[in-house]
């Protein structure tokens, strides 16, 4: 949405006699005007000399707004700008379709149904979905380092609510976020909607030759260590820290030393970012004597406490220690490459808007709704990574697709919005 500047000048003739203007400046006052334009186009049904029948709009020469007719999203009666507004509100501002139709749009004197909004969102998702293969190809290119996480969702099926999972993959270097919801086949050959099994991730990765995959310590990822031998698996130090923080907050003072040592490691990572170090320099710093001493201190504290009877510590402290011990190699594998991340926060941050949407909408009406959500959130979060407006990108994309363009690799947020 652009800011329209309207200049209001003072009428100097209204000054009292004898008054003198000492200086002049403009005071900015901001106002928002929300309204919907309803354009009525005269569409002609024409029979040509060769017998062809065609519907067409023939604009008048002085009709400055006639080009809006060419901005209609295929299969709808709204423009790309309108659809970008609706999808922005729903997926980025987490406004449910019901509240959009019954509150926001009705306040602007447009009475439309919730089903219309869902149908239009479906049409937009069909257009965006054409670009997913091109986006996936870049995200999973040879040697890529990716972060992966998942979150649960509910959807309506057969008069009851079912639980399923949406996955998120982030390639920080390529600045790409992809949400995916895949149908899989279980060990008995039965097809399942979504799910949290390793088959979902395996099928999405396919034969991609990525370099590393970072996740939390969920067993699905650990099984992949045996099946994807060429991919280095990293775990999340932030997860370990969270477990010690929880134990400390519940009274386990033994966790304090772990929190302090982990904080020092994070402090070093902040320094690398501030100094804008190269991956090679980060690799050297991560394997410096100072860093090694901190990690060895962590190891010593870990095994000293594990050597004591379990009764000497709380249950939460035991869970934190066991997590750190179990995933030690994967947690500190971030030292193997300067491009690796110390934690899995890139994927977790990308998932947060989905969790907000889940709280506001409670459940999806169908599997199709989940798939559309994955598509829209993919491009919303990728636009954030690239630093462009999703609304601007979506409008530009739909206009280019209407021209018949199929070079999808040149229509991605990082290419079309250069």
Which residues make up each language-model segment?
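Short, flexible loop/hinge motifs at secondary-structure junctions
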Residues: 1-74, 148, 282-287
């Amino acid at each position: 949405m652009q800011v329209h500047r309207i200049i209001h000048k003072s009428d100097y003739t209204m000054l009292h006699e004898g008054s003198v203007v000492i200086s002049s400046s403009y005071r900015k006052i901001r106002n928002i005007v929300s309204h919907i334009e309803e354009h009525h186009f005269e569409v002609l049904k024409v029979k040509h000399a060769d017998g062809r029948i065609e519907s067409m709009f023939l604009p008048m020469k002085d009709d400055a707004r006639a080009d809006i007719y060419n901005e209609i999203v295929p299969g709808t009666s709204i423009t790309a700008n309108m659809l970008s507004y609706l999808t922005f509100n729903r997926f980025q501002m987490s406004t449910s379709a019901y509240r959009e139709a019954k509150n926001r749009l009705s306040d602007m004197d447009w009475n439309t149904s919730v089903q219309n909004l869902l149908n239009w969102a479906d049409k937009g998702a069909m257009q965006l979905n054409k670009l997913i293969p091109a986006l996936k190809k870049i995200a999973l290119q040879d040697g890529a380092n990716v972060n992966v996480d998942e979150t649960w969702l509910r959807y309506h099926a057969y008069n009851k609510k079912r639980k399923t999972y949406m996955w998120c993959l982030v390639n920080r270097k390529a600045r790409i976020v992809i949400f995916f919801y895949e149908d899989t086949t279980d060990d008995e050959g039965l097809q399942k909607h979504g799910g949290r099994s390793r088959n979902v991730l395996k099928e999405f990765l396919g034969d991609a030759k990525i370099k590393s995959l970072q996740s939390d310590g969920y067993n699905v990822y650990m099984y992949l260590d045996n099946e994807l031998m060429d991919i280095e698996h990293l775990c999340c130090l932030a997860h370990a820290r969270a477990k010690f923080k929880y134990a400390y907050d519940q009274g386990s003072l033994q966790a304090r030393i772990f929190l302090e040592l982990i904080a020092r490691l994070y402090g070093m990572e902040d320094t690398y970012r501030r100094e804008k170090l190269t991956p090679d320099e980060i690799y050297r710093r991560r394997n410096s004597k100072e860093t090694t001493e901190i990690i060895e201190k962590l190891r010593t504290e870990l095994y000293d406490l594990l050597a004591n009877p379990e009764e000497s510590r709380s249950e939460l402290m035991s869970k934190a220690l066991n997590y750190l011990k179990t995933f030690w190699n994967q947690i500190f594998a971030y030292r193997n490459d300067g491009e690796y991340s110390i934690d899995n926060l890139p994927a977790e941050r990308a998932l947060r808007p989905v969790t907000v949407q889940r709280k506001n909408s409670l459940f999806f009406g169908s599997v199709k709704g989940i798939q559309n959500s994955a598509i829209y959130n993919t491009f919303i979060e990728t636009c954030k990574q690239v630093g462009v407006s999703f609304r601007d990108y979506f409008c530009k994309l739909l206009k280019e697709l209407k021209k018949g363009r199929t070079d999808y690799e040149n229509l991605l947020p990082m290419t079309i919005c250069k």
